[in-house]
């Protein structure tokens, strides 16, 4: 690089002197072609040079709550598309992102804790709400309170499947002897869920999730009635068939729609072994018979779709006269008689009255026979415990719980369950021996001692008291000393 400087004075004054300075720079050209080198696109930074900035971990990017059941080896998520599995866990863990509210049933909260060091449980705010207060009171006869939790920092929750508060869930939660288990629903907006158990909704979240109460349909829809009439094998009367869901004790159900996550609880076995909630996927035109008390939830398309897939079912009674005929709703063929003109004589009037009386007498006995068969069927299903069965027609997704809060009615309730039973001990014989004395006899403690006798070695003996044994040993020693 060459540098030439020229300074030329222009004017000289006593008060001011101005100069002009010219600079010229000469530089050789540089090749601007970028080589395909990986080192050019790399940047390195020493972490110690960055201060006053916290590292962004993966949990900071949490946008939706994460539901995870504890104590279950399998997955416990049931989506609206049909993929799900059973659940056997009674505790639900939830990781909640910032500014996302979570609603849990009153009295079911176990623990609140932060996610590592960036969270603070002091920022968690709580609010008690009663959603659908009047509808739940009218349709279900219960009121459920839910605790709204929200925080500006991420936090985690532990939720119990049972509620400590009395009366939550309509009086069907904490008092029963059955275990409760969680199952998680992920709603993507394509399919809605009808929850028939009023105590099943334990926790939910989602800004676009809608939870409403609707009345249970008493009769099936005309669409389902027409489809049943098209079935040639079915000879039942489809006029005003009942769904079997409606009862004066239970008038409504909960409809879940929109997008969000829901944690449901169902009744499991009292022993706690195995799974308690199962998912059944029905394809098109598939049918299944289930007890309505075990039906936890079913997929629907809106609030008026429940009457398009469920029909009340009663097990038919086998007729003793004709065992092969198991259908009780077969109609007898009706003969249509054309009216005839007769002469209005006295004899013809008597014959006409006798025929009318005979026809009326036959109709009377047909009505009695019809209601007698219906009474027999109802009585049989009631005594057998099959009075609550319904038929579900696919395509549907069903959630079934293995037990219910309602015990089976029938002859089983006659046997007292709180009666203490005697202990039964197995033997090698074909009969069993009842140990009656075990409940009255008191246990005794036996003491063992060892004596070494010549020619016999160590001899083990048991005694109730050591005093006799000690006296006998002392007497033996005295005799030995005297003999010496």
UniProtKB/Swiss-Prot annotation:
Keywords: Mitochondrion, Transit peptide. GO terms for biological process: inner mitochondrial membrane organization. It holds the Pfam family AIM24. It comes from the Eukaryota. Residues 1-30 form a transit peptide. The keyword Mitochondrion applies. One of its GO terms (cellular component) is mitochondrial inner membrane. Disulfide bonds: none annotated. The keyword Calcium does not apply. It is found in: Mitochondrion. Signal peptide: none annotated. Belongs to the AIM24 family. This is Altered inheritance of mitochondria protein 24, mitochondrial. It comes from Candida albicans (strain SC5314 / ATCC MYA-2876). The lineage of its organism: Eukaryota, Fungi, Dikarya, Ascomycota, Saccharomycotina. The gene is AIM24.
